Amino acid sequence: MGNMTLDTLKNKVKHLPHVSSRPMFGYECYSASGKFFVGFSRKDDSGIIIRLSKDVQQEAIGNKGIKPFSHGAKAGWIEIDMKSVRTADAFEWVKKGYRYALGLSKQSKK
């Protein structure tokens, strides 16, 4: 069941505008306009990481199944355990990460 949920989520991510993917840190990572915003674990089928603004990250961490992700990476990432979080809820966090990445992309082009 975990796989099916993750596949559904990946499919939704792939269809967002300006999204591309490449492997990074053992994750299948997706970027929006060149800024990474989500990664799907290749080791287990229930872990995803999402890049968020500091405020939104703090909001996310208060939820069941969500914790800070700091695998040698910069702060600003969360890890979601898909065994504890509904796909629809996870996708809401993914969309927040996507919008954050698009905002970062616009800032770096100024």
Task: Please state what every model-predicted region is.
Residues 1-110:
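Charge-dense, helix-prone N-terminal extensions
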